[in-house]
């Protein structure tokens, strides 16, 4: 009798183990089975928000997955990322954010996180940054601008969205190559305001994603782009690499991150979904209409990009803080 009971118990245990083994893959396969919250550290209606909503529309139509896009703008992106860092690491709360928010902001001010506080899921997009001038200014190239700024040190200035951003510190790195030229940095609230100021003659140079120049392509001349290669929309605009230094490369990179310790199978599933969405011809057509360039990388590669960003801007940020502390 006891042998019979033992055999039955052994059989039951084996069946239970088999069911557990089957349940684990099934759980992974069903993720996500409820809406995903995507926290945006930017305002509604701008390029990252548009990108998120285009991706969300694809996921809903193709897979029935709801992407709840929540804007939590302000505070240099800190409140949004702090909220994300405290979320449950189950893959149901993620963020579409920028390398600037993840790597530059934490080095400038205490904020309770670094880029290593998050799980990199996927790089999604790159925005080519450019320097635009008015043709009426007579500025024909970067070298020409620097020569003019040397001769008239109080005449020229460069505007860009945000006071303590990657653009600000890229500008600092660039100006080291032109110590006799004076082109001070002026912060604006956003790309729209900046372009309006340029068109009105209130600023000499605008530094912003070239997508902001495209609606005014005949009115604005792009004299340099900070990507590694020339931009498809402005093929005649040389890069800073061509004109100054091979290390002066900076694209405005956006990607998906989540809290630390999201299970690997869920990270992989999210990567698959976003990769598929960005490869869809319909999604690509919609992104092209709003001048957004898809640029997919898996999480591990996106993490390397974030480290490169952090390392590139560490020196100018340190220089800025030392100078500020000495004042």
Task: Describe the residue ranges of each PLM region.
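Solvent-exposed coil/turn segments that connect beta secondary-structure elements
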Residues: 99-100, 126, 136, 211, ...
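Hinge/capping helix and adjacent helix->loop/strand transition within the periplasmic-binding protein
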Residues: 83-92, 106-193, 240-242, 249, ...
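Bacterial N-terminal signal peptides
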Residues: 12-22
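N-terminal (or domain-start) structured segment
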Residues: 28-117, 155, 177-207, 212-216, ...
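An extracytoplasmic/periplasmic, membrane-proximal ligand-sensing/linker region
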Residues: 33-35, 265-327
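Sec/Tat signal peptide C-region and signal peptidase I cleavage site
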Residues: 22-28
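Anionic-ligand binding region
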Residues: 194-244
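N-terminal secretory signal peptides that target proteins for export/translocation
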Residues: 1-7
């Amino acid at each position: 009798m006891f042998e019979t009971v033992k055999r039955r118990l052994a059989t039951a245990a084996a069946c239970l183990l088999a069911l557990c083994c089957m349940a684990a893959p099934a759980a992974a396969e069903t993720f996500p089975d409820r809406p995903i919250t995507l926290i945006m550290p930017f305002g509604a209606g701008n390029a990252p928000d548009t990108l998120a909503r285009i991706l969300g529309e694809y996921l809903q139509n193709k897979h029935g997955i709801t992407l709840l896009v929540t804007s939590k703008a302000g505070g240099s992106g800190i409140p949004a990322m702090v909220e994300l860092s405290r979320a449950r690491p189950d893959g149901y709360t993620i963020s579409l954010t920028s390398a600037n928010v993840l790597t530059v902001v934490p080095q400038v001010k205490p904020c309770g996180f670094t880029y290593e506080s998050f799980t990199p899921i996927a790089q999604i997009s790159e925005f080519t940054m450019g320097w635009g001038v008015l043709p009426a200014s007579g500025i024909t190239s970067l070298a020409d601008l620097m020569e003019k700024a040397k001769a008239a040190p109080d005449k020229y200035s460069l505007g860009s969205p945000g006071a303590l951003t990657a653009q600000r510190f890229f500008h600092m790195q660039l100006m080291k190559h032109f110590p006799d030229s004076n082109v001070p940095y002026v912060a604006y609230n956003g790309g729209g305001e900046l372009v309006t100021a340029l068109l009105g003659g209130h600023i000499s140079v605008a530094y912003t994603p070239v997508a902001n120049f495209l609606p005014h392509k005949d009115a604005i001349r792009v004299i340099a782009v900070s990507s590694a290669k020339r931009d498809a929309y402005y093929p005649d605009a040389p890069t800073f690499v061509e004109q100054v230094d091979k290390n002066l490369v900076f694209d405005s990179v956006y990607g998906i991150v989540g809290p630390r310790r999201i299970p690997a199978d869920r990270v992989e599933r999210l990567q698959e979904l976003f990769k598929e969405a960005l490869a869809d011809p319909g999604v690509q057509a919609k992104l092209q209409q709003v001048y957004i360039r898809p640029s997919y990388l898996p999480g591990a590669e996106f993490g390397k990009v974030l480290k490169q960003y952090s390392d590139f801007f560490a020196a100018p940020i340190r220089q800025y803080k030392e100078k500020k502390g000495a004042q």
